[in-house]
């Protein structure tokens, strides 16, 4: 039974970045490639721990090393991305990034044979069989377990903001869904997903985690797929809300934002601040607005008494936290808008070509 521990939470502000990508052929269409890229040969020297795969044979995950100093995030991310692109190219593959690949049709794609994923397919059935999603996960180290749970509770309001900024998955199974992030809607059809309820402290979270494993709801703690969670193995707060990104600058803007939020909330925790009561129903409404509208979303405020546009929220957050990256992301064309424009102007070929990472 794989469960984490309070002792894992020992260090503040370390970073880890996990990105899920699509393995594609020369035409940019998803294709099975994990037998070559994950199991077929040794990993590149730059990423000695190698790459992992996800549910489908056309998906692959790249993780940075533990980033001790947040100022090294740019180099760490560029190193692992370049290594993945080169590793794939050696076997004739390309790498593409989006929350959902617009050319992916799940009935035509192969599932991975790894026992963990086969067990999930058997347990969850249809929602997992069609789960061709790809996301971005950001870890920030926290040096106290109760603090980590307190911070995760507070980050719940920010998850829809991150999702709206990142939304770049309008196409699903060959058609336009009308959503900015169809990935988020597809993924939250799985159990133990979405924005979680608040937990009183680490003991409460660990009791829940243990109960879910002991009662057979999940195989291990890694199957709690919430938008934000204390990671009891790594000793981090993990934010899992964003769609995967082609542009590393966008990924790094989200990393900067999540890191700044964790540092800010850690200081508030130390000051003894009482967290506001956030109803999950209102958080779910905010997430729906992000899914549907992306950059055009507005959100119910924390007190439930007003709404704030994404642009206003971004401006407030940048001024409050002293960051700029998400302002640039908001000011630019959104990922979902870009995909729709490219498909209209150049068709599916142009869109698939645009999603591929540069060699």
UniProtKB/Swiss-Prot annotation:
The record ties this protein, via SUPFAM superfamilies, to:
Glutamine synthetase/guanido kinase
Query: Which E.C. number(s) belong to this protein?
Result: 6.3.2.2
Q: Which UniProt keywords apply?
A: ATP-binding, Ligase, Nucleotide-binding
The Gene Ontology biological process terms listed for this entry are: modified amino acid biosynthetic process
Annotated GO molecular function terms are: ATP binding; glutamate-cysteine ligase activity
Q: Which domain of life is it from?
A: Archaea
TM segment ranges: none
What Pfam families does the record point to? Answer: GCS2 (PF04107)
Coiled coil where? none
First-level EC class = ligase
Q: Which Gene3D superfamilies match?
A: 3.30.590.20
Question: Which family is annotated?
Answer: Belongs to the glutamate--cysteine ligase type 2 family. YbdK subfamily.
- What protein name applies here? Glutamate--cysteine ligase
Q: Which organism is it from?
A: Halorubrum lacusprofundi (strain ATCC 49239 / DSM 5036 / JCM 8891 / ACAM 34)
């Amino acid at each position: 039974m794989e469960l984490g521990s309070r002792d894992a939470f020992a260090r503040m502000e370390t970073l880890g970045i996990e990105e899920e990508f699509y393995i594609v052929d020369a035409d940019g269409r998803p294709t099975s490639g994990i037998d070559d890229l994950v199991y077929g040969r040794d990993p590149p020297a730059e990423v000695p721990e190698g790459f992992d795969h996800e549910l489908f044979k056309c998906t692959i995950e790249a993780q940075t090393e533990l980033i001790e100093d947040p100022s090294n995030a740019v180099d760490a991310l560029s190193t692992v991305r370049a290594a993945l692109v080169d590793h794939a190219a050696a076997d004739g593959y390309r790498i593409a990034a989006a929350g959902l690949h617009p050319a992916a049709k799940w009935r035509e794609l192969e599932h991975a044979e790894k026992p963990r994923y086969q067990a999930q397919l058997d347990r969850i059935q249809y929602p997992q069989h069609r789960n061709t999603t790809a996301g971005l996960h950001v870890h920030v180290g926290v040096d106290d377990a109760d603090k980590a749970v307190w911070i995760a509770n507070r980050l719940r309001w920010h998850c829809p903001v991150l999702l709206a900024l990142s939304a770049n998955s309008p196409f699903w199974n060959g058609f336009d869904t009308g959503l900015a992030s169809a990935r988020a809607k597809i993924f939250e059809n799985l159990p133990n997903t979405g924005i979680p309820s608040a937990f009183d402290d680490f003991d409460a979270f660990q009791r829940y985690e243990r109960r879910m494993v002991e009662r057979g709801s999940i195989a291990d703690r890694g199957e709690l797929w919430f938008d934000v969670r204390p990671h009891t193995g790594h000793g981090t707060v993990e934010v899992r809300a964003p769609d995967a990104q082609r542009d590393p600058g966008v990924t790094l803007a989200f990393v900067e934002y999540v890191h700044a939020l964790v540092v800010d909330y850690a200081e508030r925790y130390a000051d003894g601040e009482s967290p506001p009561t956030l109803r999950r129903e209102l958080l779910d409404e905010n997430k729906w607005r992000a899914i549907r509208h992306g950059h055009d979303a507005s959100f119910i405020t924390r007190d439930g008494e007003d709404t704030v546009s994404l642009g206003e929220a971004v401006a407030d957050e940048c001024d409050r936290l002293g960051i700029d990256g998400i302002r640039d992301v908001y000011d630019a064309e959104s990922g979902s808008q870009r995909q729709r424009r490219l498909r209209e102007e150049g068709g599916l070929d142009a869109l698939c070509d645009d999603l591929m990472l540069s060699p």
